[in-house]
From Swiss-Prot:
Name of this chain's protein: Transcription initiation factor IIB
Cellular component per GO, a single term: transcription preinitiation complex
Predominant location category: nucleus
Disulfide bonds: none
Residues bound to Zn(2+): C14, C17, C34, C37
Similarity annotation: Belongs to the TFIIB family.
Subcellular location: Nucleus
GO biological process, one term: transcription initiation at RNA polymerase II promoter
Amino acid sequence: MKTLPKFKPFVQTCSDCGETQNIVEDYKNGYHVCGRCGCIVGNRIIDEGSEWRSFGDSNKVDPCRIGSASNPYLESEQLDTMISTGGGMNSYVLSKIQMKNSMRGPERALKHGMNLITAFCERSNLSRTIIDRAHYIFKNIEERKLLKGKNVEGIVAACIYIACRQEECPRTFKEISVMTAVQKREIGRCFKLISPHLERMATMSTENIIARFCSDLNLNIKIQKIATEIAKAAHELGCLAGKSPDSIAAAVIYMVTNLFPEEKKIQKDIQFVTNVTEVTIKNTYKELLTFKYDIIPENMVNKESIDKLPGY
């Protein structure tokens, strides 16, 4: 009579120290860990238990078992053992040494740049799509060595500027400069070197930023529509050719708020939101006044209000 072979249970064994008994199942991170030496033993495991939901109660331990998402642009983010920074100086030094040894020079530079992008964007409440787009642009630049020797902060700032334009949520050079503490001139230099190698680039128009500036100034939708129409008319006439979009937007908003006394804003308020100086707003506004009857839509504003516009 044919006998069945004896069943041999699967035993996890640490390949580093040979431990078989003290194998810990780490469900939060999804793998088995050797309790003696700390090395990862097996592949990722799945916890088949019920999932918990966390509602952000700071008084209790967060029950979420899911770690942070891995970055697809970093090759080093894979299954490995990391030394925690802990609370002591020794653990911090060991963690720093391990990070240097586990990542090659280019990977460390890539990770540093991506960390800066994430920090700057999250501080300014930019969306995740913009962060991912900036990561993608930065990785391409680093791999192709387009800006070798340039300041990392300048490259990061230019990547964020480009990502905002590509995702149709444009920011001005001044706004990116304030966000990253990088000079506007440096951002412009990096942008000029990167732009020829880009596949697509949305145009930076005044209409794109007027809506955001009006929202920051708590202006109603009517003011926003009139300001947008004036900006379009000024662009078609070419009366402000050579002026930056943020300067035109600031002057147009100042003009429209003067048409409606209940919505009037002083130049300092507009300067604070748009990062455009009062002198620039005043000079651009004076140039717009010359064409006020051509650019202000009469079907939305009566002629008397246009006649009463101040000269400065």
